Amino acid sequence: MLELHNVTIGQQIHSLSMALSDGQLVNITGSKGSGKTTLLRALLGFIPIDGGHISIDGELLTPMSAPYFRRQMAYVPQYLTLPEGYHEVSSDYLQLLRKAVDSGKTLLIVDEPPKELTEEDMQAVDDMLMEAVQRGAMVVTVNSRFMQNQVSL
């Protein structure tokens, strides 16, 4: 279980609490600059929180424990920095998401899909996210098109 209890991060996020169990998806929504990606970075242990706590399966996420927890997570960023020769944003993003879903990790953290994705690509994203949920993974995503189980910032 992923739990956030009264999490505060900078000026963007104040006293956010939520819980996510195995086989559940939560979609983070909000306007530009509202802290969506900041929250994902805190869940990954990349940035510290200013208040409250985050726990995974009852264990607190701290700067010391973050590397351990990241081994249980798969992260798909919004924008990819790819080697020269990779030109198709959509297929690269879909390949990275497929790898994350197939990794068997217990927690998938998926930032907003690139704007370049087609309607068909977005359906593939939705299908892969639901596949991960059905497998029992916890999925935290930022996706303005995926309307199930939203948390607005």
Give residue ranges: language-model regions.
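Conserved catalytic motifs of ABC-family nucleotide-binding domains
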Residues: 75, 80-88
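ABC nucleotide-binding domain signature
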Residues: 27, 67-78
